Amino acid sequence: MLQLKNIVKKYGEGENVVTALNGVSITFRENEFVAILGHSGCGKTTMLNIIGGLDHYTSGDLIINGTSTKKYKDRDWDAYRNHSIGFIFQSYNLIPHQTVLANVELALTISGVSKSERRKRAKEALEKVGLGDQLHKKPNQMSGGQMQRVAIARALINNPDILLADEPTGALDSETSIQVMEILKEIAKDKLVIMVTHNPELAEQYATRIVRIKDGQLTGDSDPYEPDKEDETKEAKKTACFHVIPDSRVTVSE
């Protein structure tokens, strides 16, 4: 479970301080498709970067599976990014002279995984996004939608718990955007997918939860997650199941 508690993020010093996030608190479910919706400069990408450990909060706390990150060292953040998070960027970030297969394998190169295992997992990831027959192409031989699917495969190869997507369809046409969104929707069935977007139609069509942000503050949440209250509800339902209802057919003789 991922939780942000009163997150504040400031840039600059003295009179030049800019507050990008101001008291953001939110809890995410283990598997859901969350769209963070807002205009440019509202703080949504900063929020995504803090969730992914690419940037650090000024105050507040990011809680990962019940553990505070306030005392995290660099190695802890590295482990979190490498094993728990998959990143998908609008610009794809593919290496142009490498094949599709090599680009996806690269995510495992520093993880100590054997070459044969890297190859196997990269092929499986590419098959999941419908590119199992495009392994040896270079990025410049592919369409924008295909390159974004390569980026998704690369993000999946470590089997992360959380997938973070920053405007994943921003550079794509409508038809290709639909293909990418359908893949993300499928992934969200057993992972937490958090997507930053400024496109309300896209968010409403595909996300299971829409979080709105404006001027560094959350202004709306279509399906808030409050684990304590949900636990209470589950417990109440469980208790109700064991409530004994007297049988009116039973009589007591005098």
Describe the role of every protein-language-model region.
Residues 2-207:
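ABC family nucleotide-binding domain
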Residues 217-245:
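Conserved beta-strand-loop-alpha-helix hinge in the C-terminal portion
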Residues 59, 214-215:
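Residue-level recognition of short loop/turn positions
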Residues 73, 214, 222:
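Residues at the C-termini of beta-strands that transition into short coil/loop
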Residues 247-254:
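Long, low-complexity, intrinsically disordered segments
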Residues 209-212:
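Conserved short hydrophobic beta-strand within the ABC ATPase nucleotide-binding domain
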